[in-house]
Amino acid sequence: MESADFYEVEPRPPMSSHLQSPPHAPSNAAFGFPRGAGPAPPPAPPAAPEPLGGICEHETSIDISAYIDPAAFNDEFLADLFQHSRQQEKAKAAAGPAGGGGDFDYPGAPAGPGGAVMSAGAHGPPPGYGCAAAGYLDGRLEPLYERVGAPALRPLVIKQEPREEDEAKQLALAGLFPYQPPPPPPPPHPHASPAHLAAPHLQFQIAHCGQTTMHLQPGHPTPPPTPVPSPHAAPALGAAGLPGPGSALKGLAGAHPDLRTGGGGGGSGAGAGKAKKSVDKNSNEYRVRRERNNIAVRKSRDKAKQRNVETQQKVLELTSDNDRLRKRVEQLSRELDTLRGIFRQLPESSLVKAMGNCA
């Protein structure tokens, strides 16, 4: 199905005939419009023939392969590119206050503070502006290829990616030493001596030295150590400022007087004491508990006996079925042997007749 907006067009006249400006008026069908769609425009005045080479005499080609495939070049090319652009920016900043028009001045423009501000209508566009722009771009791009490998460049710093072994070590250390928020600093103890507080501080540094050395860069200074809580508050508070097991046992013993805690406080390293129950056997609670336990034991035993009886009954049923099937197999085997003996005693002629009668 053809579209109603497109029509057949006439072939475009060659360039030579266009420059010679034929006297006939151009047809509207050449522009994709239907014939007779509008009034024919007046014929254009003949233009003087102009050579095609006069558009831009100093036309040069620019190699942009470096921007299309930068992987084919080394890192020095990119470093030189960035350094050259920074030098150009510095030169622009230095030449700006001096009164120059910057990179936007064209040749022949009046120099001065108002040179770049003056309108183009007063002076007219400069001749050969396209050629000047092409030469400007060539001058900007040529030093990029000339300065590659210059000895005056500073050494290029290449960022190294972390290896898999280092990442595995960091993950292992992060699992062994998980980050925990530091506890708030405790109030200074009036009777604590500096020598008494030195040992926990040293142990804290030793415990966290592996994690600190892995996460810090070589050039960064070591941060100050985290203040260590006082050893007097260790039984009450754990490593993360939470109540230790000793305080929980004490609170449980205070709530239930029938529970007694064994010796040993929480966080001492020797292990918390085992809690032992002392229940009075003459109390009603003990009797109710024993009765419930006995009932549960009886129920479980009754269920076990019932399952045993059901299993025995099923075994008996299966055994009887097996005997019945065995007897049936023996009977069928005897009948088969009898039939085989009968067919063996019959002559072949009778067998042929029997087969003919069946057919």
Swiss-Prot record:
Residues 54-72 are annotated as: Required for interaction with TRIB1. SMART domains: BRLZ. Residues 286-301 bind DNA. The modification Phosphoserine is found at residues 193, 230. This is CCAAT/enhancer-binding protein alpha. It is found in: Nucleus. It comes from the Eukaryota. It comes from Mus musculus (Mouse). Residues 287-314 are annotated as: Basic motif.
